[in-house]
Design a protein with these regions (language model features):
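PTP/DSP superfamily signal
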Residues: 2-9, 82-97, 114-272, 288, ...
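Short cysteine-rich clusters marking metal-coordination/redox-active sites
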Residues: 208-211, 277-280, 293-296
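Cys/His-rich Zn2+-binding "zinc-finger" mini-domains, especially FYVE domains
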Residues: 267-283
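Glycine-rich nucleophile elbow surrounding the catalytic serine of serine-hydrolase chemistry
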Residues: 106-112
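Short functional micro-motifs and their immediate structural scaffolds
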Residues: 107, 216, 285, 299-302
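Glycine-rich, flexible N-terminal cofactor/catalytic loop recognition
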Residues: 13-54
Length: 328
């Protein structure tokens, strides 16, 4: 597909705020909304920082959005990119002007503006980032933010919480930021298929081979490429969480899946352990938050591994499962 050229706007020599697009600026935290004459130059502020800005820092802005994030590779910006884009679009389409601000004005704010250009101008990550750097030569987001924006591009510049890409990202993010693995948020766990009576027609169910208890859906499987040995953490390997297919995994003897609700009690507070059927307690596999190696050689982090010889497939049951569940 032919690549689109970045929008053409001349770079600015303004020191206080750097205009990335007409009425869209980026700066460091010590710069406010006033121009050289002391009059407000922008109407809205998007602040990215470790702590919310004080009242003095918000003075002069009609609307504000705060995104809490440290400038480190493990910080989560990806989940907030759509919120930021919606905020900026609303301001600019309404005739206002916006300032995207972080402490130094070179990493977090640059990542937000780059994502906005990707989404609104249909640019690749490389195109949008190069455009910002041409205007602001000191722009340099950390490698974790670069990786997150590349994931954003793979999702079509839309955060899809149901995509394999986002599920893998979310689990890796938990591993890096929560070493003790306590108090996991509920949205991390997939719905237990044994507690619902409807599924999508394209979903395949997997049940315990011994007691036939439903365990997980095909949409919970997190596929991977065949590989060798432990890989570095995800933000150093952009290709790991990409959109993968189940094809090419014939050498895998296990399914690697997202956590399911019935696993919650076993996972909290421990880094590794066995996965047992919640009905008959037969061993299904194992989990390790710091990763396990698949039989194909690929290192999966974190790993929730169910052995294929311990489960059976139940294909295309249709919309209603009440009759099926009633027989279990």
């Amino acid at each position: 597909m032919q690549e689109r050229a970045p929008p053409s706007f001349p770079p600015s020599r303004t020191k206080a705020m750097v205009p990335v697009l007409p009425r869209l600026y980026v700066s460091g935290a010590d710069l406010g909304p006033a121009d050289d004459s002391g009059k407000p130059a922008v109407t809205a502020l998007l602040q990215v920082d470790s702590e919310p800005p004080g009242a003095a820092a918000l003075a002069g802005f009609e609307s504000t959005l705060f995104v809490q994030a440290l400038d480190r590779p493990q910080s989560d910006l990806l989940s907030r990119l759509d919120d930021c884009a919606a905020f900026l679009s609303q301001v600019l389409e309404g005739g206002g002007s916006a300032l995207v601000r972080c402490h130094a004005g070179v990493s977090r704010s640059v990542a937000i503006v780059t994502a906005y250009l990707m989404k609104t101008n249909h640019l690749t990550f490389q195109e949008a980032y190069a455009f910002v750097q041409a205007i602001k030569p000191d722009a340099k987001m950390n490698e974790g933010f670069e990786w997150q924006l590349q994931l954003y591009e793979k999702m079509g510049c839309k955060v899809d919480v149901n995509s394999t890409i986002y599920k893998q990202y979310r689990l890796k993010n938990i591993t890096e930021n929560c070493p003790e693995i306590e108090g996991l948020p509920g949205h991390v766990f997939a719905i237990d298929p044994n507690t619902v009576h409807q599924i999508l027609n394209h979903d395949t169910l997997y049940r315990c081979r011994k007691c036939r208890r439903l365990l997980f859906r095909s949409s919970s499987i997190l596929p991977h490429d065949e590989g060798k040995g432990p890989a570095a953490f995800a933000h150093k390997k952009v290709s790991e969480p990409g959109p993968l297919s189940h094809a090419g995994q014939t050498n895998c003897t296990s399914y690697f899946i997202e956590p399911v609700q019935w696993m919650e009690a076993a996972l909290l507070g421990v880094l590794e352990g066995q996965l047992l059927c919640p009905k008959c307690t037969s061993k299904l596999g194992s989990f390790h938050w710091h990763g396990e190696q698949c039989s194909c050689g690929h290192w999966v982090t974190p790993a929730f591994q169910v052995h294929k010889n311990r489960v059976d497939e139940v294909k295309r049951l249709g919309k209603h499962l009440g009759q099926f569940l009633g027989k279990m």
